Regions:
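Short strand-loop junctions, especially beta-strand C-caps/beta-turns
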Residues: 102-103, 132
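N-terminal beta-strand-loop-alpha-helix module at the start
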Residues: 17-102
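Residue-identity detector for glycine
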Residues: 8-12
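Short, contiguous clusters of charged residues that form electrostatic/catalytic patches at enzyme active sites
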Residues: 81-84, 109-113
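Extreme N-terminal basic, low-complexity initiation segments
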Residues: 2-7
């Protein structure tokens, strides 16, 4: 499948190759830098609806993230492998991308410190990031924005049907926080699993039915598995002494 089709462009391979942006070994001048974290690889994000040669997207593999806790090796390989592939897809769709591997000599191994030198090197006057799902990173980027002082664009990840503040607004002043209420409001608002104003099936939930066991004749569908060769990533982790737990077949990574 052509890379651009994976990103939703629906164009042929020859056109993809014609407009693929080169790798930026040394960041060229840019007006704006946008940070993409490892769990924000959303090809459908509104950031990517337009190609802007003055915007530089940045992804980075940093010890800050591999070392704050011991992670399973499959998790680290999965993150780095997906990040590298996503960077390739962005370039193939005409976006400028700077990708810092863990072993890049310019890599300070800190997200804020890397952002500082990238901003200085490119001359960018503004930067942006998508809201992290983890409090630790959310606070770090808020602190960096306050200290750095440059105008910052904070965007939603657009991963979910709600924004970060909607749940709090829904339950404001309520004594009980019931998932049932949230679930119903979301279905009414989005039209998902609805026939007009009524729920599909005639009732709002089937909790009682779902507690039953599946029939003995039920055969679960096989999992969707892949076969990625991430031996280069594993060798890099080992060479630089990144401590992980668990084992992995890096030559046939299944996710």
């Amino acid at each position: 499948v052509p890379v651009a089709q994976e990103m939703g462009e629906g164009v042929g391979r020859s056109e993809v190759l014609q407009r693929t942006m080169p790798k930026e070994q040394e960041p060229r001048p840019a007006h704006r830098v946008r940070l993409i974290l490892g769990d924000q690889l959303n090809a459908a994000h509104s950031w990517y609806t337009e190609r802007d040669t003055h915007t530089l997207y940045v992804l980075m593999e940093v010890r800050q993230e591999t070392d704050y806790a011991w992670h399973h090796v499959q998790k680290v390989l999965g993150f780095f492998g997906a990040m590298r592939r996503f960077a390739e897809q962005l370039r193939a769709n005409g976006h400028r991308v700077l990708y810092l591997t863990l072993d890049d000599k310019r890599n300070t191994q800190s997200i804020p410190d890397n952002l500082r030198w990238i901003m200085a090197r490119t001359g960018a006057t503004t930067w942006g990031y998508q809201l992290p799902d983890e409090y630790r990173l959310d606070q770090q980027l808020k602190d960096h924005a306050a200290l750095y002082g440059a105008p910052v664009e904070v965007a939603d990840t657009e991963h979910f049907l709600t924004t970060r503040d909607e749940l709090g607004a829904l339950f404001a002043g309520k004594k009980q926080y019931l998932m049932e209420r949230f679930y119903r409001v979301m279905r009414e608002r989005t039209g998902l699993l609805m026939n007009g104003d009524t729920p599909i099936g005639g009732q709002w939930n089937f909790d009682k039915e779902n507690r039953g066991r599946p029939p003995k004749t039920h055969v679960a569908p096989p999992p969707l598995l892949f076969d990625h060769d991430l031996r280069d990533v594993q060798q890099m982790l080992e060479k630089h002494g990144v401590n992980t737990i668990g084992t992995v077949d890096a030559q046939h990574f299944p996710w």
